[in-house]
Amino acid sequence: MLYIVGTPIGNLKDITYRAVEVLRSVDEIACEDTRHTLGLLNAYDIKKPLFACHKFNERAASEKIIEKLKEGKNIALVSDAGMPLISDPGCILVKELIANNLEYTVIPGASAFVCALIMSGLLDYRFSFVGFLPDKNSEC
């Protein structure tokens, strides 16, 4: 089973109890930056093998994850902050999971855009999220 796990977006204490339980229970963790994820895992005394899954190796990492899942391993996918797939790697992997009829689930976590909406004071019963602003090196 693949677990898509939400991680804190600033404060390491903002991780859910369920996310910590899953990270403790899986065989391996796929992450954007192993150094960054190691900091989170160390804060909760979690010792698991890590391997990179980022925008530069997502296709190869997805193939590796598929192989491990077919071997019966449980894998967690995390991003540096927030939810994988939301402006982070994971879309290729989920498409491959569906194509290979492999199970996955989402462990919710912190949400940057919901926090921003609430902090804005513009809260209403309707809102739309159309993505994050491009980074300073991107073309608009």
Q: Which residues does each predicted region cover?
A:
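Glycine-rich, flexible N-terminal cofactor/catalytic loop recognition
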Residues: M1-F56
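Generic beta-sheet signal
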Residues: M1-V5, E71-S79, F127
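Residues at secondary-structure transition points
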Residues: D14, F56-E63, D88, D124
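Glycine/small-residue-rich loop that forms an oxyanion/phosphate-binding "nest" at active or ligand-binding sites
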Residues: S62-S111
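Class I SAM-dependent methyltransferase SAM-binding "motif I" and its flanking Rossmann-like core
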Residues: I92-C140
